[in-house]
Structure formats: structure tokens, C-alpha cells
């Protein structure tokens, strides 16, 4: 984030993702909380600033569109925590929903379910391109299209996914280098729709 001159608070904790998100939100003392996972690269400073502003102006949240393909109905599009900005007022209005995985929800999906049930509008960035299929096969984004390893959302953020695999980690290092050296390109990527 230094490349974009953005001040970031990094944390290192060996806890489940949803538990960590609950911990962060439970201690938030600012108007907007932003989460950027370590395998996600904003492609510009402006997308971060725009997302902060959008969450503030809407008194809601914004995130990358995702579907939990392993949890029925495998069609619910929600704002994933990979790139996620939420107003703390909105979070409190919703009754502080947990980010933990639940029967119907993957990590952070319950937040979107709660917003939908309460009639709170939120925004998602949809995938535009991706580099390759995951080992288990391509991921469907409900009826919208597809995403996979190295997905670009809204032409503005790059999310690697599955960084635990060495080949993906090498790809991520390359993409970080591309962004820092102003040569990131989606040439050779597959369209999501």
C-alpha cells in the first residue's frame, strides 16, 4: 500500500478469518473499516478512496462480488471480505452480524444476508477478467459469469485466490511487481462474462 501512499494497519493473527473479522469490527473506533486481504491488490489509490467514500455516503458497505459455490443455493451473490469497506454505523444498525461461517453463509456472507433482510442496499464490484481456472474447476458467479485464479473485479482490484499454492504465490509476486512498476495488464486474461 506504500506504492499508493495509503496508511494501513497490518495485523498478524493465527485465527480463523471470520473470527478475526469479528474481532476487528468489535474494536473499531472509526466511521469506516476497510479490509484488504493479503492476496488482493488495489490497482489504483482511487478505488480505495472511492470505496471509503461510497461506504460513508451510503452508510453501508462495498466489496467484491462472490458466491459460495460449496454452500447451497450456490447462487447468493454477496460482498466478500477480500476487499471490503463498511460504515461502523451500518454494522451496528444491522445488530453487529458475525463474519463467521454459518450454515447458510461463508465468511462475511451473513453480513450481506442481514443487509438484504433489513432492506439495506450495498454495492459489489463484479468480476471482469480472470487468469485461469482453479484446480477444482471454474467458479460460477450465479448467473452473472465466472471467476477464478487472478480475478480482476470492476477493472479496479486484483484478487489472487488460493495463495496457499506455490504456483499461485509466484503469480501474485509477479502481479505485485507489475502494479508497482505500472505495467499491469489484463492481456491474456479470460473475460468473466
Residue ranges and their predicted role:
Residues 36-39:
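Active-site acidic Asp-centered loop
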Residues 41-114:
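Conserved catalytic core of nucleotide-sugar-dependent glycosyltransferases
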Residues 33:
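Short aromatic/hydrophobic "clamp" motif used to bind/position activated sugar donors
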Residues 1-14:
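Acidic donor-binding segment of Leloir-type glycosyltransferases
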Residues 105-193:
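C-terminal catalytic/acceptor-binding lobe
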Residues 12-27:
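Glycine-rich, basic loop-to-helix element that forms the pyrophosphate-binding segment
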Residues 10-12, 65, 126:
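Residue-level recognition of beta-strand->loop/alpha-helix junctions
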Amino acid at each position: 500500500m506504500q506504492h499508493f501512499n495509503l496508511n494501513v494497519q497490518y495485523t498478524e493473527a493465527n485465527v480463523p478469518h471470520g473470527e478475526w473479522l469479528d474481532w476487528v469490527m468489535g474494536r473499531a473506533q472509526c466511521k469506516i473499516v476497510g479490509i484488504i486481504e493479503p492476496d488482493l491488490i488495489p490497482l489504483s489509490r482511487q478505488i480505495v478512496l472511492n470505496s471509503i467514500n461510497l461506504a460513508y455516503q451510503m452508510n453501508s458497505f462495498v466489496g467484491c462480488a462472490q458466491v459460495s459455490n460449496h454452500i447451497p443455493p450456490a447462487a447468493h451473490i454477496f460482498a466478500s471480505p477480500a476487499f471490503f469497506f463498511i460504515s461502523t454505523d451500518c454494522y451496528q444498525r444491522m445488530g453487529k452480524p458475525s463474519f463467521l461461517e454459518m450454515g447458510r453463509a461463508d465468511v462475511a456472507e451473513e453480513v450481506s444476508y442481514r443487509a438484504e433482510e433489513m432492506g439495506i442496499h450495498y454495492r459489489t464490484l463484479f468480476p471482469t477478467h480472470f487468469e485461469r481456472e482453479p484446480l477444482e474447476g471454474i467458479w460460477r458467479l450465479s448467473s452473472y459469469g465466472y471467476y477464478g485464479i487472478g480475478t480482476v473485479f470492476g477493472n479496479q482490484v486484483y484478487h489472487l485466490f488460493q495463495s496457499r499454492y506455490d504456483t499461485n504465490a509466484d503469480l501474485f509476486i509477479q502481479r505485485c511487481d507489475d502494479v508497482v512498476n505500472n505495467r499491469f495488464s489484463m492481456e491474456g486474461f479470460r473475460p468473466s462474462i
